[in-house]
Amino acid sequence: MRALIQRVLEAKVEVDGQTTGEIKKGLLVFLGLGKEDTLEKGQKLIDKILKYRIFDDEQGKMGWNVSQANGGVLLVSQFTLMAQTQKGLRPDFGPAMPPSDAKALYEQLVEYTRSQFENVQTGIFAADMKVHLINDGPVTFNLEVEA
């Protein structure tokens, strides 16, 4: 399981011209699910994301998490994060969880995230999404939980 997190000033997801999720300051989280991933591993990753201190505190250092910064979370499924890219010139998506399983796990992780944090927005699983963002910094991190 992999998450690409970006500290943003604002972000939104559109599907067919309609906004499905939108936040102001906060975290844009792209989430990739692998074949061996579980709800337990996903919950550990979500907990880490919500506690990860990448927002400026009063001293201007990365000392606050998204809650302390009064931010939001925009959670977007992205199977391409699971691609193997070491060989060849085309990504291999073999390590990604099959869509039917991934959708169920993604929905459970959205529900879990909402149980842990108030301001959670999402994209639509497997939709052709347009993601708009203003990256703050830029500050971007790749977090991973091994399968």
Curated annotation (Swiss-Prot):
GO cellular component: cytoplasm
Keyword set includes RNA-binding: yes
Claim: tRNA-binding is one of the keywords in the record: yes
GO biological process: D-amino acid catabolic process
Keywords: Cytoplasm, Hydrolase, RNA-binding, tRNA-binding
EC number: 3.1.1.96
Enzyme class, UniProt record, top EC level: hydrolase
Domain of life: Bacteria
Family matches, as Pfam families: Tyr_Deacylase
Motif position, Gly-cisPro motif, important for rejection of L-amino acids: 137-138
MF (Gene Ontology): D-tyrosyl-tRNA(Tyr) deacylase activity; Gly-tRNA(Ala) deacylase activity; Ser(Gly)-tRNA(Ala) hydrolase activity; tRNA binding
UniProt main location, coarse: cytoplasm
Cell compartment(s), UniProt: Cytoplasm
Subunit structure: Homodimer.
UniProt function note: An aminoacyl-tRNA editing enzyme that deacylates mischarged D-aminoacyl-tRNAs. Also deacylates mischarged glycyl-tRNA(Ala), protecting cells against glycine mischarging by AlaRS. Acts via tRNA-based rather than protein-based catalysis; rejects L-amino acids rather than detecting D-amino acids in the active site. By recycling D-aminoacyl-tRNA to D-amino acids and free tRNA molecules, this enzyme counteracts the toxicity associated with the formation of D-aminoacyl-tRNA entities in vivo and helps enforce protein L-homochirality.
Record text about domains: A Gly-cisPro motif from one monomer fits into the active site of the other monomer to allow specific chiral rejection of L-amino acids.
Family per similarity comment: Belongs to the DTD family.
Name of the protein this chain belongs to: D-aminoacyl-tRNA deacylase
Source organism: Acinetobacter baumannii (strain ACICU)
Gene this protein is translated from: dtd
